[in-house]
């Protein structure tokens, strides 16, 4: 057992369902990635889940961001694999107070290019009424203002899934799950977490790969993985659809990550670069490095890119949130394991009351 955890237990803490931490190994580059293989694993995982539970309809909230874009691509691939009609993919975009024209447009274009019908449901009116009902002024951009939007979207998706006898596909990725960067019982919850085993940096790589494969229009791996539209029409129509989806996807890849709960939000301005967080996830959870070793390894690898001050602040954020937000991981939906570990309780967990100072 890790000596830090022994000290924690001696001080009165309990392990609960903590998975045994590995002995400290040398730091390594995080999450070795072949985008085609990651995508194929996600497609296979979703297809297997749908087949086992006998469901032919899925519901997805498409925001125009990276995570929901990848889930939509995986759903198209899984439906192709199962020979299911693409009409069983129900996409919804739910603009709120911080939604930008760029993300809304990209959500529309991506769905159109893939041949997926999408419905727009504005949450502004219902959230304003909810905030009024609970005595909120509807203007102060506090936690209730932001989280009520995320929970309203989840409520809509869950009810829509009930209406079609389907399941809600979760969009949260492995990095967000590690950090608890989600709204409890909002985007935190779904019926199957398609991205739960894929960190943010890999989500970006897979989306970029998909767009480049599709944009070639040569009928290569991308079409075999479900890129080819299932809608009827000639070759030129399919080619235009692929081109439209690829163009939208490349702009999504270039868009700063944001939940868009208030205007101008940029996630990495608040929590630090996802490139660092994914490095910390891999080297803490898999390689067992402690705080000092993590900092030294990150400084050596990323010092010139991010600077030592940002590395230190991001590491503090990572360790604090990894522990303090563990309660969200303790009641998360099933997902797909892509790499050698994930944040399911059967794979890797940590006491949510552990003092981060011992890490």
What is the predicted role of each segment?
Residues 1-64, 68-217, 238-359:
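ATP/NTP-dependent adenylation/nucleotidyl-transfer catalytic domains that generate, transfer
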């Amino acid at each position: 057992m890790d000596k830090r955890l022994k000290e924690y237990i001696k001080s009165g803490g309990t392990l609960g369902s903590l998975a045994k931490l590995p002995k400290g190994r040398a730091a390594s580059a995080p999450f070795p990635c072949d985008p085609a293989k990651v995508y194929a694993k996600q497609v296979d995982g979703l297809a297997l889940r749908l087949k086992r539970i006998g469901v032919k309809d899925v519901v997805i909230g498409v925001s125009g961001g990276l995570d929901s874009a990848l889930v939509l691509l995986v759903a198209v691939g899984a439906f192709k694999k199962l020979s299911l009609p693409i009409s069983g993919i129900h996409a919804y975009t739910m603009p709120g107070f911080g939604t930008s024209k760029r993300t809304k447009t990209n959500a529309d274009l991506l769905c159109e290019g893939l041949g997926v019908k999408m419905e727009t449901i504005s949450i502004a009116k219902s959230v304003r009424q909810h905030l009024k009902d609970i005595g909120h002024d509807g203007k102060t951009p506090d936690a209730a203002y932001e989280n009520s939007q995320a929970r309203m979207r989840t409520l809509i998706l869950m009810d829509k899934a009930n209406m079609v006898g389907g399941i809600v596909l979760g969009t949260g990725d492995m990095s967000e799950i590690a950090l608890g960067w989600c709204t409890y019982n909002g985007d935190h919850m779904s019926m199957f977490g398609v991205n739960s085993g894929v960190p943010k940096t890999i989500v970006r790589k897979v989306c970029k790969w998909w767009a480049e494969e599709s944009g070639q229009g040569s009928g290569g791996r991308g079409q075999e993985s479900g890129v080819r539209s299932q809608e009827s029409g000639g070759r030129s129509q399919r080619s235009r659809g692929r081109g439209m989806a690829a163009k939208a996807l490349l702009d999504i890849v270039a868009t700063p990550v944001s939940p868009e709960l208030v205007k101008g939000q940029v996630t990495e301005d608040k929590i630090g670069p996802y490139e660092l967080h994914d490095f910390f996830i891999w080297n803490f959870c898999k390689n067992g490095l402690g705080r000092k070793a993590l900092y030294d390894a990150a400084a050596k690898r990323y010092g010139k890119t991010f600077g030592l001050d940002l590395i230190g602040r991001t590491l503090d954020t990572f360790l604090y949130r990894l522990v303090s937000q563990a309660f969200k991981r303790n009641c998360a939906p099933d997902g797909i394991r892509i790499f050698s570990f994930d944040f399911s309780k059967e794979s890797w967990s940590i006491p949510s009351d552990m003092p981060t100072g011992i890490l």
